[in-house]
Swiss-Prot record:
The keyword ATP-binding applies. It comes from the Bacteria. This is 2-succinylbenzoate--CoA ligase. GO terms for biological process: menaquinone biosynthetic process.
């Protein structure tokens, strides 16, 4: 098994120098131009003291600057600690302290007492110094640290190596196939692994990326119609927004894949996509698996509604309960293994030991396999509602709520109940006139009695993170305040 590889972007710039690497609304950059920009950033970062093996925090929004910084850190051999721009100052300071970073590179106003903060513009306007550029990458070396959302307790820094990122891109290419004319529309934040993984695929495949700095449904919809996009990564909310804009039209046949992540998609949404001939590939993955680890191809979209598919070619997956592998249709914890799976968390030996056992990663997600080995993700274990001893999966109730024509968005969490321990409570964004009573009655017709929400509240919008995933922990806080 190989232990080193040529520096990815340098190799790509050597192989296909004039091919378009990144396209933005008004700008195009070839792989050679990207390499030259990265070398320049590298020399500026070297001047401010960034060296091989150090950890550097990156707090930036999607854009050419962020892309060049991420690559420049790999050129120097430093580890990029990617920070979520939507976090509070306290949360960011905590993560930087936890990751033991030597400095922060940012395009935002940010002050920190104990860590040097370098604005990207200042660094680039400052002096340069000859950089010691890594012409080879060791696949065992850490490339990035990304903090998990921390649905329970403090977030943990997931260490992803060059080997993890390489395996993820290879697995994805086996799964989706590669074409010379591929163009992946990138609108996911690059501080999330889903967005970051596109940067890796971009240079490894030699594939054009259409970069959208921030989520803009109108621009994305238009780009899918006119910019030759073949693949886009989405979550359910984005897919719903795009379908609304599509109306009676269809997207060009060149759009060959919508990669849907971020949790199970409601059935009515998938049915609408089939009607519009939109090829949706449902996926399952997490920071710890360097993006997707399971995918359901569009061939099975309706035959296996709600399934996240089968593992990527070099990955394995099983369902365990109390440490024992369970038969088909038995519910348990999803456990995965593969070369794209992290070796552990930074400075968290206990959490690493608890999560990774004999090379198998215990995801904390609940699911089951059908008789053909297709995975069905039920929910995060931490989101499970246990009511009078019965397991209730919020995703199932949300799917029912979303099938109502007057419901635009839905989120379900557990609410403390004296009799049952917990009961479901729903939060709804309306798309038309509907009352709480009508919503609860609608659920009564479609769900077992114990699964019917005890209460439904209306919100203008649901709390979501930067990649548009529903933040149930914030809904739980709202329940406590109600």
């Amino acid at each position: 098994m190989m232990e080193t590889m040529p520096n990815w972007l340098m190799q790509r710039a050597f192989l296909t120098p004039d091919r378009t690497a990144i396209e933005m609304e008004e700008e195009k950059v070839t792989f050679m131009q990207l390499h030259e920009k990265v070398v320049s950033v590298c020399e500026h970062l070297t001047h401010v003291g960034v060296k091989r093996g150090q950890k550097v925090a990156v707090l930036m929004k999607n854009g050419m600057e962020m892309i060049t910084v991420i690559h420049a850190l790999s050129y120097v051999g430093a580890v990029a600690v990617l920070l979520n721009t939507r976090l509070s100052r306290e949360e960011l300071l905590w993560q930087m302290d936890d990751a033991e970073v030597i400095c922060l590179v940012t395009d935002q106003d940010f002050e920190a007492k104990d860590i040097p903060v370098y604005s990207f513009a200042e660094v680039m306007n400052g002096p340069k110094e000859e950089a010691s550029i890594q012409e080879e990458f060791s696949l065992k070396e850490a490339m990035t640290i990304i903090y998990t959302s921390g649905t329970t307790g403090k977030p943990k820094g997931v260490i992803l190596t060059y080997g993890n990122h390489w395996a993820s891109a290879v697995g994805s290419s086996f799964n989706l196939g590669l074409r010379d004319d591929d163009c992946w529309l990138a609108c996911m934040p690059m501080f999330h692994v889903g967005g970051l993984s596109l940067l890796m695929k971009n240079i490894m495949y030699g594939m054009r990326i259409l970069l959208v700095p921030k989520y803009d449904a109108d621009f994305i919809h238009k780009a899918l119609q006119t910019r030759g996009v073949t693949i886009i990564s989405v979550v359910s909310k984005m897919l719903t927004d795009l379908l609304e804009r599509l109306g009676e039209e269809t997207y060009p046949p060149s759009l060959r894949c919508m990669l849907l992540g971020g949790g199970p998609a409601p059935k009515p949404l998938l049915e609408a996509c089939v009607e519009k001939r939109i090829p949706v590939y449902q996926t399952y993955g997490m920071t710890e698996t360097s993006s997707q680890i399971c995918t359901l191809s569009a061939d099975y979209m309706l035959m296996k509604v709600g399934s996240a598919g089968k593992p990527l070619f070099q990955c394995q997956l099983r369902i365990e309960k109390d440490g024992v592998v369970v038969p088909p249709f038995a519910e348990g914890e999803i456990v995965v293994k593969g070369p794209n799976v992290t070796g552990g968390y930074f400075n968290r030996e206990d959490a690493t030991r608890e999560t990774i056992q004999n090379g198998w990663l215990h995801t904390g997600d609940l699911g089951y396999l059908d008789e053909e080995g297709f995975l069905y993700v039920l929910d995060r274990r931490s989101d499970l509602i246990i009511s009078g001893g019965e397991n209730i999966y919020p995703a199932q109730i949300e799917e029912v709520l979303l099938s109502h024509p007057m419901v635009a968005e839905a989120g379900v969490v557990g609410m403390t109940d004296d009799k049952w321990g917990q009961v479901p409570a729903a939060f709804v964004v309306k798309s038309g006139e509907i009352t709480e009573e009508e919503i609860l009655h609608f659920c009564e017709e479609k769900l077992a009695k114990y699964k019917v929400p005890k209460k439904a509240w209306f919100l203008e919008e649901l709390p979501r993170n930067a990649s548009k995933k529903l933040l149930r922990r914030e809904l739980r806080q709202l329940v406590e305040e109600m």
